[in-house]
Amino acid sequence: MAPRSRQRVDIYLLGRGIVDGVSQMTLEAMDALRASRLVFDLSGDAKAIRKLHHNVIDLFDDYWTGELCDDVYKRLEETIVAEVRNNGPGVSIVVDGHPMVFDDVNWNLLRNSKRRRLNVVALPGISCLDTMMIDVGADLGDGAQIVHVNQLVLYGISLDPHLQTYVLQIGKFGTDFFSRETKRNLPGRFTPLAAYLTRFYPADHVAILIVSLGAQSIRRRVRLGELDSARAFLHRHQDDGLTMYIPAYPRPIANERFASAIDDLDHLKTIADLA
């Protein structure tokens, strides 16, 4: 049965997880998909989605056009809204990963839904961050920085080397033509990024370039100062959800008094009534 809703749903925003197929898709998302009139696939695995629904439109060719990313996102958003306006509610969009992690199309649909008088419902899914912390063996609960590679330099974002860092879309550094096909990366493409990162980390600090696929994950270790030496690897996997994981430096305790207090029952009695 479809997920409960007080009113009809015009658009469901769904994710099928990181690995190929739908093994990481939640039961709630599958129910919503099966209850839909039409499914737009932006996940890159329309074949798997067609096993769950008979009416699937693959938007692969509409996505990989070589245009600027914002132009692609706008057109896809307009396509989905036009379908609902012209033919009625009951549309689902399926993407890879979590539907609301690093997905401008879905966020625009959700943020503009009230103005358009559309009921847009996003359902949780499994993102690359969920799987990557298992792949690299680091708990996000210890604190993390998650940044888009171009925004890192564009906005001059300062990084804390004592927090683990995930740099998304690293293979697309230096361009917004993210779906424009290229033959190779020229020498020096990643030199400005290496220079930026080594403002916060030593040049010999080792990072991991990773495509998170569980047991089939693809990785390459590289020193930050030598990042440009991995340009062939970065090109080969630029469209595969490639991320750079930078491990954290250990951080010493800065407030010994607070550290002592949080383990002290007498201190707890001074800030709360015990049961």
Task: Name each model-derived stretch.
Residues 1-123, 242-243, 267-275:
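Class I S-adenosyl-L-methionine
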Residues 2-14, 32, 38, 119-121, ...:
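Beta-strand/loop-alpha-helix module characteristic of Rossmann-like adenine-cofactor folds
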